[in-house]
Every structure is written in structure tokens, then in C-alpha cells.
Design a protein with these regions (language model features):
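N-terminal secretory signal peptides that target proteins for export/translocation
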Residues: 1-3
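Bacterial N-terminal signal peptides
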Residues: 6-16
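Electrostatic cytochrome c docking/interface patches
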Residues: 15-27, 77-85
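The canonical Cys-X-X-Cys-His
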Residues: 29-39, 61
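Flexible linker/context regions in extracytoplasmic redox proteins
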Residues: 41-51
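C-terminal capping alpha-helices of c-type cytochrome domains
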Residues: 51-76
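Blade/loop signatures of beta-propeller domains
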Residues: 79-124, 272, 276-277
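Extracytoplasmic/lumenal domain signature
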Residues: 115-130, 154-175, 180-188, 193-217, ...
Length: 582
């Protein structure tokens, strides 16, 4: 279904030419997969992404899609690393999972750089993802190695020192979340809902497991490993497909799946909506509607060993009736998967992509605002021992919940106006005192144009420091203007990361910045939206920074750059920074 959507854009140019299929496969991976096998809300790319392709390339893509012959994509070339043993324990302060800790605080306590040195960060090396137009995966750093996925499904293990290639592995679809490394094992998921375990030293496959059979299911968030269990979040692209008037919307239900790490066997699976979707009314064109549906889990689960709980945020419902567990923070039992409590913050939120198009046929009659929880909850223990579970929503509201009292709401703070691509998108960070929240509020000039009407470069952005104890605003770093840069927005959609004294945050405008945790002052600013000379000789360019955040360990700061979805700037590079580039 995802390929069919791309094919409709170019099928008129297609001709029976089987010789084009292999080139078309590579082009699909490079130009289409990041949208059509990516975010559910990103199934319609900016018009420029397709129109910029030469006619011959459009024909090649159409030929590949019509023949549907599987052709392996090639890995990005690069200097091979010298043979060496991989020792994960050699890292005193690794970044081995999406949120660094089980609490998902994205706080690197021992980064190998001081706050005074952040202004001296310079490019150490750049690695190009050959032929791709997006680079938005979350890197991890363990044992002197970098692990990072890609839109084409290639997973790379690189040398932290110089970007050399230890190994590559080809998944069945794009890999957007973090690669979780534990000892000799590396775990990750792809955008066709398959979880993988590979040898962290060699990349050899140990097992793969399909965690959901729905055709739109995917693993967009990162898995989490704890106490001999691998917890996998499941979301979907059905919110996008559901916008088509001829599609029977919708039957997907978000879930968390617990797997046995040595074998991949399923231990339990808990749907965020307990009720199986049933036929509802037909739409105006006679297409059968289904519900309840949705409540995808878009981000890494948060582990609470004290209460033996797992916390996740859920997305909206796709159809009516809207579920009471959508747009909510949900606590599950670690052992059984049983739901302990639910705190819903936006009721009645039934939304799909029809609600942002000219054809409203499949848009729920009482359409909601699309206020997902896209980020992982952050479990913070304050200096007095009190615990607060913090989560930001696409409504632009940051919440503090009491994890020790059924998730009771402690406070809420509004930082923006929110919306389908607004509010708080992919993640925040906390140093235990404050939570550092990037604001998106990404806006189109024409909301109904689905990214084709141009970006409003005057709206969005800002980094907010919120005191965890009471939700009070400590400071705000106002967004920088885009000026006349094309495909630019000041929105901060990517997750932040924090080290002692500094917060790192990437922007849709391509800038990667460090802010003082004291007052929000900009300590360092680099524009990644440019061409880079890469260690692997690949033509590479940076662009918008979105979805994935920074990883910091061993004195090195990593970020991916390039995200053309919704009209942002394309790019295909992984960047490593260190003090003076050493």
C-alpha cells in the first residue's frame, strides 16, 4: 500500500522496461522510502521532492513499483575499520539507548566535554548515507563504536574516532529508532514492524520477529531492554492511509510487545485499545468505517523499577469512537503487560489525514486536534526524593504526573499553540531540576495543502526550561528567524539532549545549537544545511534536523541531518563534533 501511494505520482510516466527495475529500486529507497515507509503523518511529501526528479528517474521508480521485484540496496561505501574486539563494557558513560537511561531523561552525566568547551566544538568527521534524501535516525554510542540506522534500512556500526565502517546490516525496511546495545547484542526495529537482534561486534543476524501483522504497523520508536526482556513500541501508518475516501478506516491498534532477548519469542502483547475494531457507519461514498482504532506508541517505553511499571505515551484515535486510552500516558506491569492506570489528557481526539486535505470524506465527523504524545515520558527523581513523570504533548502542553499515585496530574504548563505538527513532537530532556522542551509549532501557509503550500517561516520554535517540581517556566530561548532560506522553519521538532550545563537541540532550519541550562543563552551554533566532505567519499549534505536527537559520549557529539518530509530540507549525513575537532 505504501509503494502504491508513491506509484500514483509517477505511474503515468511508466513504460514496460524491466531493465529499469534495479535502478528504480535504488531510487525508491533513496527518494521515496523516507516518506512512504516513515512517519504516519508524512505519507505525502512536498511537491518539490517528486517534481525535482528527472523524467527517467520517475519512469525507473514506476517500473520498480509495478514489477515489485525485490532488489537489494547497496550500503554506503567507506573505509573499513581495522579488526578489533568489541567490548561494550569499555564505555564508562555510553549512550546505549534512545534516552540514555531507563528513565529516558536524555541526560549524559559524563559527556567527556565541559560546558566551557561547548563553544569550541568543531566537526570531527562526517559520514554520508549514499543516495538517500533523509537522515533522521537516533545514533547510539557504545564501546568506541557508533550504531545508527537509515531510511533505506541499512544499519551501520562505525568507529567513533574516525567514522570507519565495522559492519553493515540490511533490515527489511527503514530503521528510525535507536539501536539498543547490551553486551554483545544489538536490538532495533524497522518500519514494517519487525524487531531484530544482531551481534553487536559483527552485525550477524541472531533473530528477527514480526511484532504486528497489520499491514500499516511499524516500529518507529526505540525498543528498551530491562531485566531479560525487550520491550517494543508499535505504531502505524494507517493514520495516513486512512485519509483516502476508498479506504476502510481504521483497524490498527497501538501496542507494546515484550520479547525474550535471546530468542525473540513473544512473552506478552498489550494493545492500547482493548476492544477489537468493529464495523461502524459507512462514509459518504459507501466505504465501511471501523473503530475504535489508533493509539499508536511512537516512542521508547520508560522503565520504573521501583513500581515495576512501564510508561508509554499514546497517539490519537484514527476513527470514531475515540478510545479512552488515546492521547494518554499509560502505565503497564513489567511482568504481565497488564494496564495499571491511564491518564488521558485529550478526550475525543479522532483524526486522520483526510482532516488536513481538501477531501474530508474519511475525516471523523467530530474531528479531533491530533494531539498525540510523540515523546517518551521522563521519570525524574527530585532532590527531596519526590518523583515526577514528565511528558510533553502535541497540544504544546507539558504535564507532570505522580507515578506513585495512579498518575495523578500534578501540574501542566502550556508553551505554544500546538497542532498537527505543532506542540511538542519527539522528545525532551531533563537534568533532574528542569525539563528542557523543544517547541515545534511547525506551520504551513495553507493547512489543507498537505505540505505543498509552503512553510510559514515566521512561526514556531523556541526552547523552554520548565521546573520539574512545580511546572514553572524558568527561561525561554526564543527561535531564530529563517530569513530567506528555502524550505525553512524555526520549529524545534527533534528531541533535545542535556549534559551538565548545556542543552543540545537541532532545528528544522538545519541549525544545531547548544544552550546554557542556566539562562538559555546560545553557547554554540552550527548550520548543518550545507555540503560536507565525508570520510566514506559519499556526496552528502545536511538539512533539517528532525525525529532523531543528539547522542553524546566520549567527548563526541553526534547528530543526523536531513529531513525533507513536510517540505523540510533534505539531507543524508551523520555528523560528529568534538572539541577543536580532535
Amino acid at each position: 500500500m505504501l509503494r502504491r501511494a508513491c506509484a500514483t505520482m509517477v505511474v503515468a510516466l511508466a513504460a514496460p522496461a524491466s531493465a529499469l527495475a534495479q535502478d528504480g529500486a535504488a531510487l525508491y529507497s533513496q527518494q521515496c522510502a523516507s516518506c512512504h515507509e516513515g512517519n504516519a503523518a508524512a505519507r505525502v511529501p512536498a511537491r518539490g521532492v517528486i517534481s525535482a526528479l528527472p523524467a527517467a528517474q520517475k519512469r525507473a521508480i514506476a517500473t520498480f513499483l509495478s514489477t515489485a521485484r525485490p532488489v537489494a540496496a547497496s550500503a554506503s561505501p567507506g573505509p573499513r575499520c581495522e579488526a578489533s574486539m568489541f567490548d561494550a563494557s569499555a564505555s564508562q558513560a555510553p549512550w546505549s539507548a534512545w534516552g540514555v537511561t531507563l528513565a529516558n531523561d536524555r541526560f549524559q552525566r559524563n559527556p567527556g566535554i565541559t560546558v566551557d568547551e561547548t563553544s569550541k566544538l568543531k566537526l570531527k568527521w562526517a559520514f554520508g548515507f549514499e543516495g538517500e534524501n533523509a537522515a533522521a535516525a537516533q545514533p547510539t554510542i557504545v564501546g568506541g563504536r557508533v550504531f545508527v540506522g537509515s531510511a533505506s534500512g541499512r544499519v551501520y556500526s562505525l568507529g567513533l574516532r574516525d567514522g570507519c565502517v565495522h559492519w553493515t546490516f540490511k533490515a527489511d525496511a527503514g530503521v528510525r529508532g535507536a539501536v539498543v546495545v547490551d553486551g554483545t547484542n544489538a536490538y532495533f526495529g524497522d518500519l514494517r514492524a519487525t524487531a531484530y537482534s544482531v551481534d553487536a561486534a559483527t552485525g550477524e543476524l541472531r533473530w528477527k520477529k514480526k511484532v504486528d501483522e497489520h499491514r500499516s504497523a511499524r516500529i518507529a520508536g526505540s525498543p528498551v531492554l530491562y531485566n531479560r526482556r525487550l520491550y517494543v513500541p508499535v505504531s502505524s501508518g494507517e493514520e495516513g492511509i486512512g485519509g483516502q475516501a476508498t479506504y476502510e478506516c481504521c483497524t490498527f491498534r497501538g501496542s507494546v510487545v515484550a520479547l525474550d532477548p535471546p530468542t525473540g519469542d513473544q512473552l506478552w502483547k498489550t494493545y492500547m485499545i482493548g476492544e477489537t475494531p468493529k464495523p461502524q457507519a459507512k462514509n459518504a461514498r459507501g466505504t465501511q468505517m471501523w473503530g475504535p482504532s489508533g493509539a499508536g506508541v511512537w516512542s521508547a517505553p520508560t522503565i520504573d523499577p521501583l513500581t515495576r511499571s512501564l510508561y508509554v505515551g499514546t497517539g490519537d484515535s484514527y476513527s470514531q469512537p475515540a478510545a479512552p486510552t488515546s492521547d494518554a500516558i499509560v502505565a503497564l506491569d513489567l511482568e504481565s503487560g497488564a494496564i495499571k492506570w491511564v491518564q488521558q489528557t485529550t478526550a475525543g481526539d479522532a483524526f486522520n489525514m483526510a482532516c488536513m486535505s481538501a477531501d474530508l470524506t474519511n475525516c471523523p465527523e467530530k474531528a479531533g486536534p491530533d494531539h498525540d504524545f510523540g515523546q517518551s515520558p521522563i521519570l525524574v527523581t527530585l532532590r527531596d526524593g519526590k518523583r515526577v513523570l514528565v511528558a510533553g504533548q502535541k497540544s504544546a502542553v507539558v504535564y507532570g504526573f505522580d507515578p506513585d499515585n495512579g498518575g495523578k496530574r500534578l501540574w501542566s504548563t502550556t508553551i505554544g499553540r500546538g497542532g498537527e505538527l505543532g506542540g511538542i513532537e519527539w522528545g525532551s530532556a531533563s537534568d533532574g531540576d528542569n525539563v528542557y522542551v523543544p517547541l515545534s509549532d511547525f506551520t504551513f501557509k495553507d493547512r489543507k495543502a498537505l505540505g505543498r503550500g509552503g512553510i510559514d517561516a515566521t512561526v514556531g520554535g523556541g526552547l523552554f526550561a520548565i521546573r520539574v517540581s512545580d511546572g514553572m517556566r524558568v527561561w525561554v530561548a526564543r527561535p531564530n528567524a529563517c530569513a530567506d532560506k528555502a524550505s525553512c522553519s524555526p520549529a524545534l521538532s527533534a528531541p533535545s539532549a542535556v549534559v551538565p550545563g548545556a542543552v543540545l537541540s537541532g532545528s528544522i532550519d538545519g541549525h544545531f545549537r547548544a544552550f546554557s541550562t542556566k539562562d538559555g543563552k546560545v553557547l554554540w551554533d552550527v548550520d548543518t544545511a550545507r555540503d560536507f566532505e565525508t570520510v566514506n567519499g559519499v556526496n552528502a549534505r545536511g538539512g533539517s534536523i528532525d525525529v532523531g536527537g543528539a547522542a553524546i559520549a566520549g567527548g563526541v557529539v553526534l547528530t543526523t541531518s536531513g529531513y525533507p518530509t513536510w517540505g523540510g530540507m533534505r539531507g543524508n549525513v551523520l555528523l560528529a563534533f568534538s572539541v577543536e575537532g580532535r
